[in-house]
Amino acid sequence: MLTSISADIMEKLKILSDAAKFDVACTSSGASRSGNGNDMGSAFASGICHSFTADGRCISLLKILFTNECIYDCKYCINRCTNDVERVSFTPEEVCKLTVEFYRRNYIEGLFLSSGIIESPEHTMQLLYTTLFVLRNKYHFNGYIHIKGIPGASSEVLEMIGYLCDRMSVNLELPTAEGLRAVAPNKARKNILTPMRFIQNGIKDSRMYHGNSSMKNRMYIDEQAYYEQMAEIKDSTARLSEYHRSLRVATDCGKADKLAEKSWGMGVQLDPGVVCETTDVSYGDGDYINNTGLSIKRPDRYYVPAGQSTQMIVGATGESDYQIISVAEAMYNRFDMKRVFYSAFVNVNMDESLPGIGQPPPLKREHRLYQADFLMRFYGFKAGELLSEDNQSFNDYIDPKCQWAVGHLECFPVEIMTADYYTLLRVPGIGTNSVRRIIKARKHAKLSFTDLKKMGVVLKRALYFITCDGRMMYNTKLDESYITRHLIYNERPDTMLLADNKSCTYEQMSIFDFISE
């Protein structure tokens, strides 16, 4: 029982956490930041959702809206201005108290904060900035924060808030501009892409300013590139910690102004005790101000260190899977997105102009899009390889990697002992970890199918596409329909031999399929 939280705040929490449930937040923190002895929380290490750190740990986030008031009338949103729902808003202080109280009780390890639009995008983002500023500087919360960027807000407030959060996301909402106009008449594609570009450039400039490369090379399909990037991150973290220590020493000696001017060349450093005009919080120790008196950045912070992400709604409009993954690919390549999320459409407003009334959300389709997304991010696939203008939808019965493989049987079977890293990555049932184990082990001995299974290879999918020392696991026919049927039913080929002249389809198997001639 949170006895220090008032009943009014708890009622707001109940409403605004429920209103936030359709915003996707299942993302890794992407930032490693341990406790420093002075602040509370660490980014590495009723609205609670789960996320995953860079090392695979599951953490909990307090997932809430700042307000469910909104001036927009998006057809897919429960908080649209024409809906008759109870409207409530937090204050910055209330959000901070909730976050701190939940953290102290070990309920959460971070905050996911989104919001409806109050008065204007600029006014709303200023409220979110004030919230994060108070949380970081008054309550010294050092944990993970994911903030939603609002299209239409100024670049100044986006810059200020980017140095307080770990991740910022601007929702693309729909894959196409036509779809956006149809269901969100108050939003424009250009207004969404503009802050995305600003955040991208801010991240790039910040990383280069700290001596790192930009975040463009993030597809770890090459193990050497992967380990080089990990070493770079470790090195940059060490240098950042060293600078932070030197800054504190200089501050203690009364030389902070000189050090900041020499090292960063960024404006005038505030003396401790300067009060932010928009809050009652004192700040200093490396914060900088613009002409409004608001704190912009600290030199020891990265700008949006965990990168930016976006979200697309799946099934609200008529876009195909091919269009969706093509847009996702463009987001990764042109905007350096850390993640693109997909949200199966739920017709919460029972709007007759939208699909889904009386139907379950397209969760299987959402799942296939996530699988394809991983193939593009970590396996080197392109959107045009997975789908095409002639085939614009993923198979409901087999995953995208299997679908690609059975459509490109000219590339198979692959010899385990000689195939290169990239070729092995394209084999169904073989992941990045298994590929590295295979390449390492085959230098010392010939590998068998039993060895592959111990290395994590999923043989029930891989056996149709590989050979070990020139031999397949079973006498398998390289036929698209034949292999597809076996992948669907997960049966062993030696128990399901078909006649050579038999026509294979994706229908339910008959008793005659089990009879060998």
Name what the model sees in each region.
Residues 32-34, 214-221, 345-350, 385-401:
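A glycine-rich phosphate-binding loop feature that marks nucleotide/adenosyl-phosphate handling sites
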Residues 1-69, 458, 466, 474-504, ...:
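Flexible, acidic/Gly-rich N-terminal and inter-domain linker regions that tether
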Residues 64-93:
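Canonical Radical SAM [4Fe-4S] cluster-binding loop centered on the CxxxCxxC motif
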Residues 96, 119-381:
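Conserved AdoMet/S-adenosylmethionine-binding subsite of the radical SAM
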Residues 61, 74, 113, 170, ...:
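Conserved, mostly hydrophobic/aromatic
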Residues 100-114, 372:
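Short Fe-S-cluster ligation motifs
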Residues 353-425, 461-517:
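Long, highly charged, low-complexity intrinsically disordered interaction regions
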